[in-house]
Amino acid sequence: MLIEVVKSKIHRVRVTGADLDYIGSITLDPELIEAASLVIGEKVQVVNINNGERMETYVIAGDRGSGEVTLNGPAARKVQKGDIVIVIGYALLEIEEAKKFSPAIIFPDEATNKLI
């Protein structure tokens, strides 16, 4: 049997933009993507600390070192620039594998979204 577990978590980053006219997704600095063991195109959940909204989208890469966290398409209506969000990726694992699994959880600087 498979269970869904947290695989990756970017804890408390500041939204740098919201682009309603973009096709969709969340644009992230590749440094954040790599540190959290996320993959381009991976489905993620985004939780907005400011308003309680939860949404699903997928990851695309922005400019390296930019600290970018931009919600695109319909998700742009759920955030405002400056909001604090958590980005979570999940994985399906066998129960025994899940018991031993350790997720990649990162805590970037909340003001700059840079890795600490």
Predicted feature residues:
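Compact, glycine-rich, soluble single-domain proteins
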Residues: I3-V5, I10, R14-K99, A111-T112
